[in-house]
């Protein structure tokens, strides 16, 4: 909202010399936001001149210029710049005559330039063979309009000032506007009336309500016919609660808008259109009540406010034919729609140069109806901006009277008794404000006088009841609906600076839940071991869900998006891997060939009830059964952990070959994540439709129940090629919620070993088809309690081995708690482990 200071000063006392910065500071103190300062940007000598004579001189470029003699000061007097009273000025316009009064910018003056903060400085300069000693200005050059084809003739504004008079003050170009940002809940501040009231709150200056400064005669008993026939109100709120009409006859619509009004409208951000339209805009800015003028002679019968009919259209003032929606609120007469209520009028009743009789409308429309209509037709307007935030229903009568007053004063019209008032506004319900509510909420012990004074200052009616105040909010504050709103107003008016800067004390017993702590531990552990955490979009294609969402082919159910960002990714993910593989592909394209990434996030697994219950309309309170059905339809959203490893885990260095990433690295990440929560995870050979048939493992928690947590493996070569990925890409995915569910309540650290360990290697030859993990478990089982740790260190297939067999080498570590083991004891335990593997899988010790 832009507020010209001269206008603001009419309704609140401004101390002489008050600066825009001081006005901004006062308004900021009551919750408005500073945006900027606006001026016309005119400096230096700009005076009224009179054209004495001119000579037209055709030029070689086809243009005709006028070499003018212009009087810029009284005869024999010095001009404002100290020069002669008559100046020779070159002018390219052709719309003026000898004797016309014009605006002359003398050398040394500065006008707004084509670029911000770059003024256009006037100087005497030679052009077209003459020294032009100044410039005759157009309306656009002065910032008063868009007309640049001709110069501004003051007679067209109804002005006949003295030659040499200061044109800046004459045209109101010396005014300044402060701009503030108005929050959506404070629509009343979209007016000079509202801003003046807020300035009075901030400074204590006297406030004069412009709505009370204009006489509002009662409408004629047999006034203009108006009816509201809203048969489909939105949220049970009738589209119009107040509708005021007034009639003004014998209006001269061709009269110019006075320059003071043009200047104020321009500073407020609204361009001048015509006198009648400018008056309605001026009153809207002044009082915050949008008004509209109709050409009375073009109306057919009375006015009816109703919803649009099917197939109905309307040509609006911008000459656009609009197909109307059944929710659109219309202003109609006997001929049909003549305006979109609260948004824009229709072309059929537009005020024009030939208009003689004007019907003035000031109404109060339902904010939701206006907001929906404006958005539906992509037609934001100054009127809709105010209506959708809430307009004072009690100001409509005053606004209509103010428009009538200005039409009489400026357009020569005569007020007619033919008018009407439809008012179905309900009185606001009082809000109960307990005595202890504000200090408990805000933390400041405001006195009773401060609370009462603040509530009265904003226009509230305050009365006493037992243990509380009853407060009736003012009609211009529809945002005040409960006691918390009143508490905020008290804090705002008394001063936010009264609230102490004290950090609240955190209540005991709060903090991270066990699940949150473990999830963070998992993520931190993987990051500590060199992996990078990433976040992928949760939207994927159906084929990706089918491929990774289940080990077996056949597709999986998934949640489809109603309005996807991308038609190729129209489903919520059932696996984290599609997003991670997409991230890997993008990184590879940018030259990052060695990659280890992971993500923790939710996947979406729909149940059978998905979509079985329809969401009720916004205005209806859903039943418990409906809510239960909606809740049942929400997909299950477990948290998963997934990772992708490709390239090399160790790069080639002098004396050290590169180590390629593979399944073992994915399993290592699984072990790291599981160890972070105290769970042992065992890989069990398995199959998955997206993974290499011989390089896939199911991940099982090593507890008594043996819970399946997920899978790991290498992408099938065909899929890797299809995705433009390297041949070997290791992946894993775990149900993180399930992993945490089987985690022990406490991770008990083992005792520190007091005796040395004995280490030995064991190489076993088994068939190719025997999983290494199964052999490892057999050795551990057979070796007994002395075996402290076992790791697979080699998987050899080749020369020296029988066909279809492999050699698995394990590193064994033995230790006893009460003694130092002998080599014989360690060897005996190793042999027992080998024997158990031989018993189960036919394993033989490789010599």
Curated annotation (Swiss-Prot):
SUPFAM superfamilies: Anticodon-binding domain of PheRS (SSF54991), Class II aaRS and biotin synthetases (SSF55681), Nucleic acid-binding proteins (SSF50249), PheT/TilS domain (SSF56037), Putative DNA-binding domain (SSF46955). Gene3D superfamilies: 3.30.56.10, Bira Bifunctional Protein, Domain 2, Ferrodoxin-fold anticodon-binding domain, Nucleic acid-binding proteins, Phenylalanyl-trna Synthetase, Chain B, domain 3. Residues 40-168 form the tRNA-binding domain. GO terms for biological process: phenylalanyl-tRNA aminoacylation. It is found in: Cytoplasm. GO terms for cellular component: phenylalanine-tRNA ligase complex. Disulfide bonds: none annotated. Mg(2+) binds at residues 479, 485, 488-489. The keyword ATP-binding applies. One of its GO terms (molecular function) is tRNA binding. Its cofactor is Mg(2+). It catalyses: tRNA(Phe) + L-phenylalanine + ATP = L-phenylalanyl-tRNA(Phe) + AMP + diphosphate + H(+). Keywords: Aminoacyl-tRNA synthetase, ATP-binding, Cytoplasm, Ligase, Magnesium, Metal-binding, Nucleotide-binding, Protein biosynthesis, RNA-binding, tRNA-binding. Its EC number is 6.1.1.20. Residues 753-846 form the FDX-ACB domain. Its main location: cytoplasm. Binds 2 magnesium ions per tetramer. Residues 426-501 form the B5 domain. NCBIfam families: pheT_bact (TIGR00472). Tetramer of two alpha and two beta subunits. Belongs to the phenylalanyl-tRNA synthetase beta subunit family. Type 1 subfamily. This is Phenylalanine--tRNA ligase beta subunit. The lineage of its organism: Bacteria, Bacillati, Actinomycetota, Actinomycetes, Micrococcales.
């Amino acid at each position: 909202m832009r507020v010209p200071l001269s206008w603001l000063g009419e309704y609140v006392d401004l101390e002489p010399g008050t600066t825009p910065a001081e006005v901004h500071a006062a308004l900021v103190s009551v919750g408005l936001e500073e945006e900027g300062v606006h001026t016309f940007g005119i400096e230096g000598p700009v005076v009224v001149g009179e054209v004495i004579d001119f000579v037209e001189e055709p030029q070689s470029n086809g243009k005709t210029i006028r070499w003018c003699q212009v009087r810029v000061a009284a005869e024999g007097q010095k001009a404002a710049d100290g020069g002669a009273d008559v100046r020779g000025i070159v002018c390219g316009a052709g719309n003026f005559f000898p004797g016309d009064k014009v605006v002359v910018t003398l050398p040394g003056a500065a006008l707004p330039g084509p670029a911000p903060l770059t003024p256009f400085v006037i100087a005497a300069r030679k052009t077209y063979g003459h020294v032009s000693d100044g410039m005759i200005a157009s309306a656009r050059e002065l910032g008063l309009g868009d007309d640049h084809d001709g110069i501004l003739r003051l007679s067209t504004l109804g002005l006949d000032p003295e030659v040499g008079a200061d044109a800046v003050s004459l045209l109101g170009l010396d005014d300044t506007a402060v701009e503030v940002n108005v929050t959506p809940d404070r629509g009343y501040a979209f007016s000079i009336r509202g801003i003046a009231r807020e300035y009075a709150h901030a400074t204590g200056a006297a406030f004069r309500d412009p709505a009370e400064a204009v006489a509002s005669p009662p409408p004629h008993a047999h006034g203009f016919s108006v009816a509201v026939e809203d048969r489909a109100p939105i949220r049970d709120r009738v589209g119009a609660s107040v509708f005021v009409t007034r009639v003004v006859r014998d209006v001269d619509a061709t009269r110019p808008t006075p320059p003071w009004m043009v200047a104020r409208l321009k500073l407020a951000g609204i361009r001048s259109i015509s006198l009648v339209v400018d008056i309605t805009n001026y009153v809207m800015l002044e009082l915050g009540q949008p008004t509209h003028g109709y050409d009375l002679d073009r109306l057919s019968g009375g006015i009816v406010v109703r919803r649009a009919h099917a197939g109905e259209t309307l040509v609006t003032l911008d000459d656009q034919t609009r197909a109307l929606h059944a929710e659109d609120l219309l202003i109609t007469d006997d001929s049909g729609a003549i305006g979109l209520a609260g948004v824009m009028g229709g072309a059929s009743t537009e005020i024009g140069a030939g208009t003689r009789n004007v019907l003035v409308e000031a109404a109060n429309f339902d904010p939701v109806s206006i907001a929906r209509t404006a958005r539906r037709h992509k037609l934001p307007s100054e009127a809709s901006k105010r209506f959708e935030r809430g307009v004072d229903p009690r100001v409509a009568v005053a606004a209509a009277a103010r428009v009538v007053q200005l039409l009489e004063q400026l357009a020569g019209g005569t007020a007619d008794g033919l008018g009407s008032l439809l008012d179905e506004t309900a009185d606001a319900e009082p809000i109960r404000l307990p005595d202890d509510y504000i200090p408990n909420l805000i933390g400041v012990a405001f006195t009773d006088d401060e609370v009462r004074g603040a509530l009265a200052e904003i226009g509230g009616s305050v009365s006493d009841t037992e243990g509380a105040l009853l407060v009736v909010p003012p009609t211009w504050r529809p945002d005040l609906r409960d006691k918390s709103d009143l508490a905020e107003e008290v804090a705002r008016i008394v001063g936010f600076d009264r609230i102490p800067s004290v950090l609240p004390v955190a209540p005991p017993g709060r903090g991270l839940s066990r699940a949150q702590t473990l999830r963070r531990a998992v993520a931190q552990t993987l990051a500590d071991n060199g992996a990078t955490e990433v976040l992928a979009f949760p939207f994927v294609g159906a084929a990706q869900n089918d491929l990774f969402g289940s080990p077996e082919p056949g597709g999986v159910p998934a949640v489809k998006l109603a309005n996807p960002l991308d038609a190729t990714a129209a489903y919520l993910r059932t696996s984290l891997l599609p997003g991670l593989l997409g991230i890997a592909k993008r990184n590879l394209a940018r030259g990052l060939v060695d990659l280890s990434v992971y993500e923790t996030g939710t996947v979406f697994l729909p149940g059978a009830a998905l979509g079985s219950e329809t969401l009720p309309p916004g205005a209806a309170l859903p039943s418990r059964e409906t809510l239960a059905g909606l809740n049942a339809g929400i997909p299950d959203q477990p948290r998963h952990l997934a990772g992708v490893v490709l390239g090399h885990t160790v790069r080639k260095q002098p004396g050290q070959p590169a180590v390629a990433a593979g399944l073992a690295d994915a399993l290592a990440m699984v072990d790291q994540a599981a160890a972070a929560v105290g769970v042992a995870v065992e890989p069990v050979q398995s199959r998955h439709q997206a993974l290499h048939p011989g390089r896939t493992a199911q991940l099982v928690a090593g507890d008594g129940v043996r819970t399946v947590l997920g899978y790991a493996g290498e992408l099938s070569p065909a899929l890797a090629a299809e995705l433009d990925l390297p041949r070997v890409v290791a992946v894993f995915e775990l149900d993180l919620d399930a992993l945490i569910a089987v985690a022990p309540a406490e991770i008990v650290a083992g005792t520190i070993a007091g005796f040395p360990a004995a280490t030995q290697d064991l190489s076993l030859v088994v068939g190719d088809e025997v999983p290494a993990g199964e052999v490892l478990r057999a050795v551990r089982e057979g070796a007994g309690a002395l075996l402290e740790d076992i790791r697979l260190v080699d998987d050899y297939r080749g020369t020296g081995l029988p066909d279809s067999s492999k050699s698995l080498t394990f590193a064994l570590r033995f230790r006893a708690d009460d003694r130092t083991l002998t080599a014989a004891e360690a060897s005996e335990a190793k042999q027992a482990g080998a024997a158990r593997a031989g018993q189960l899988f036919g394993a033989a010790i490789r010599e």
